[in-house]
Amino acid sequence: MTRGVPRLAVAARHFSTAEAAGVKVAAQDGQSPISDLSVVLRGGSRYATVPGVSHILEKFAFQNTVPKSALRFVRELELFGGKLYTHTTREHIVLRTQFLKQDLPYFVDAFANVLKETKFQQFELTERVAPVAELDLLKRESDPAFTALEAAHEVAFRTGLGNSVYAQGYSPVTLEDVKEFARQVYAKQNVAVVGNNVVPADLQQLVGTAFADLQEGSKVTQAGTTTLHGGEARVRTSTGNALTIALPIAEPKPVYHALASFLGGPASMPWSVGASPLAQATVGTHTSVKATYHNYGDAGLFAITIKGDSPAEISQVAHKAVQALKDTGAEVTEEQAARAYAKSKFAAAEAFENPDSSASVIGMELLSGVSRIAPENVQKFTPAELSEAAAQLSASAKPVVAAVGQVHALPFADELF
């Protein structure tokens, strides 16, 4: 309860947005000596022309370009004291770097060279890019919860959003595949530049110069429309056990963010089980559980993922989780609704404060024109609205269940619904 606790007015952080030479730019200044710069590309796995090509294209970033070799870039990066990160999502490829504030011109130029003048050489694909992509996949597949959520996406959407984020060995990506995809993605229509702790006017001027001769291109689109499906996936592995219960959503709504926050999962304090319905479902077990909502604009996926060593305990928690969703559809109290709102607001603010996640969020908004997670846009829903959303999900005609690990001992969909 927060009755009687004073609250202070908090100033919202704002990014100034503009277009520079046809490229969308968002930036905000700050007092830190470290700047953060990201290039967000509309080219995630949902747009992949062949399986895994988005992941491979991401790993080609900062390989040999016409102006300089990969080795030269590495040496220069170390001289400047900067750091480089890249990752791929279902919707975007993100190239991100951190550096001392005065070195902004160098890194804007480096990003522009990646998009305009990467050589895409066969030996790089064979000796550098493909092995790194394989290690990336192996690292993620060591987590059964990741594998379960990936499998749930594949069942729910099949193609497009159902495409694997990571390149898979069974479907090799050729150099021509990468070149063709790069020609589509590396275009002004698919690029957003996001700067944290940079002077907005400086970034806009530098982008306007460095990206001026980047091809105009056209918006990358998904092949075919997004369709929703129900079903099951059973993945036998020895890396651990996990179960994802997923419910595809045809019309994404902000209320599902609040519902995921309400159902919860991980405790807010390390020595506490937590008071959320899903946290209570794990009492007496050695399992972890979390509700997540994945909003992709044209569709969504509400997921509850359970992980643990014991298949019997996972099965027990899964039944309780489904019941918790049904119970939420029956009744939500005012206090529970207030708790869901506070957690949603905090999660959105936390994402905005983290330079990595904020770059993805802001870049996504620049490219799509739709705000999905800004803290000031988080709505406060009534208990009735939360109950209605939960009731609609629990009555879904297309539930998805993805089991990973000792699948012979994990529940099937018809045992849960």
Curated annotation (Swiss-Prot):
UniProt transit peptide range: 1-22
Keyword flag Oxidoreductase: no
Cross-referenced Pfam families: Peptidase_M16, Peptidase_M16_C
Keyword entries, A-Z: Electron transport, Membrane, Mitochondrion, Mitochondrion inner membrane, Respiratory chain, Transit peptide, Transport
Keyword Transport: yes
GO cellular component terms given for this protein: mitochondrial crista; mitochondrion; respiratory chain complex III
Membrane-related topology note: Peripheral membrane protein
Chief location bin: mitochondrion
Entry-linked InterPro entries: Metalloenz_LuxS/M16, MPP/UQCRC_Complex, Pept_M16_N, Pept_M16_Zn_BS, Peptidase_M16_C
Segment forming the signal sequence: none
Subcellular location: Mitochondrion inner membrane
An individual GO BP term: mitochondrial electron transport, ubiquinol to cytochrome c
Cysteines engaged in disulfide bonds, as pairs: none
GO MF annotation list: metal ion binding; metalloendopeptidase activity; ubiquinol-cytochrome-c reductase activity
Assembly with partners or alone: Component of the ubiquinol-cytochrome c oxidoreductase (cytochrome b-c1 complex, complex III, CIII), a multisubunit enzyme composed of 3 respiratory subunits cytochrome b, cytochrome c1 and Rieske protein, 2 core protein subunits, and additional low-molecular weight protein subunits. The complex exists as an obligatory dimer and forms supercomplexes (SCs) in the inner mitochondrial membrane with cytochrome c oxidase (complex IV, CIV).
Function field: Component of the ubiquinol-cytochrome c oxidoreductase, a multisubunit transmembrane complex that is part of the mitochondrial electron transport chain which drives oxidative phosphorylation.
Annotated family: Belongs to the peptidase M16 family. UQCRC2/QCR2 subfamily.
Protein name as annotated: Cytochrome b-c1 complex subunit 2, mitochondrial
Gene assigned in the entry: QCR2
